[in-house]
Amino acid sequence: MAGLKGLLFGGILFAMCGGLSEGQKKKEMVLSDKVGQLMDWASKRPVIRMNGDKFRRFIKSPPRNYSVVVMFTALQAHRQCVVCKQADEEYQILANSWRYSSAFTNRIFFAVVDFDEGSDVFQMLNMNSAPTFINFPPKGKPKKGDTYELQVRGFAAEQLARWVADRTDVNIRVIRPPNYAGPLMLGLLLAVIGGLVYLRRSNLDFLNNKTGWALAALCFVLAMTSGQMWNHIRGPPYAHKNPHTNQVNYIHGSSQAQFVAETHIVLLFNGAVTLGMVLLHEAATSDLDVGKRKIMCIAGITLVVIFFSWLLSVFRSKYHGYPYSFLMT
């Protein structure tokens, strides 16, 4: 009797092990098919286009031993999403840099879901804005850090690469296609300057023109203090359109980020305040008649008061709790 029980127990154990083995083999086959299909798509196009069915099969459904970075966007012309197109260009640069690097493996894939091709995915994730970047790890659900902070970090390929490295430990060296516009513009500028110097070679007094140098220095200072360098490094969007109200925001609500339009606004305000100060100085020191000096003084005061008030209001909107204001809140 004891021998019969042992034989029965052994049979059950063998059947269970066989079942587990078959299940494991099936799981490995499914995983192998998924990875093989993704590798095939990635070899043809570094950014894999996905609809709802592909998203559920290759990203939401187990098994998975790879990460997938997905850009949720709206690239169709009737959506009028300028930021989506700009972000897509940077995303393509990042994906191409990974695809054609010597370190390319099946650890990570890059995909895109367009709203017009996968609106059900947007509904599944309760997503109501685009573009949005999310990293789907090999195991578990995406955490808070797996959603890219676009408004803070911008969509430059280099910033996306740092975020990918932080979330997946995959380091991507971004390689941009050659851009000859910069060197051509620099060469044209040098040619124009060289031509002017050659034509005026008999009289180079214009190089000592204080007004010209002052204007050049002023333009440089206004550009730098308005945040142009930050834009160059981070690549932020020009503005943000609320998908619910269609209201366009030109000023970012956080002190940690800005829009390109915001830079232009601040540059205009700073320039107007500077012009007002120049007019006040000229009104006090010039030899013009009293009437013209009064007009210059009034214009200078008006420019300083109005545009400095607007500048402070912009500052207050970004740094919540800032106690000071002037005329405008």
Swiss-Prot record:
Keywords: Cell membrane, Disulfide bond, Endoplasmic reticulum, Glycoprotein, Magnesium, Membrane, Signal, Transmembrane, Transmembrane helix, Transport. Pfam families: OST3_OST6. GO terms for cellular component: oligosaccharyltransferase complex; plasma membrane. Residues 200-212, 280-294 are cytoplasmic. It is a multi-pass membrane protein. Residues 41-169 form the Thioredoxin domain. It is found in: Cell membrane; Endoplasmic reticulum; Endoplasmic reticulum membrane. GO terms for biological process: protein N-linked glycosylation via asparagine. This is Dolichyl-diphosphooligosaccharide--protein glycosyltransferase subunit MAGT1. The keyword Ribosomal protein does not apply. It comes from Xenopus laevis (African clawed frog). SUPFAM superfamilies: Thioredoxin-like. Residues 1-23 form the signal peptide. InterPro entries: OligosaccharylTrfase_OST3/OST6 (IPR021149), Thioredoxin-like_sf (IPR036249). Glycans are attached at N65. Its main location: membrane. Disulfide bonds join C81-C84. The keyword Cell membrane applies.
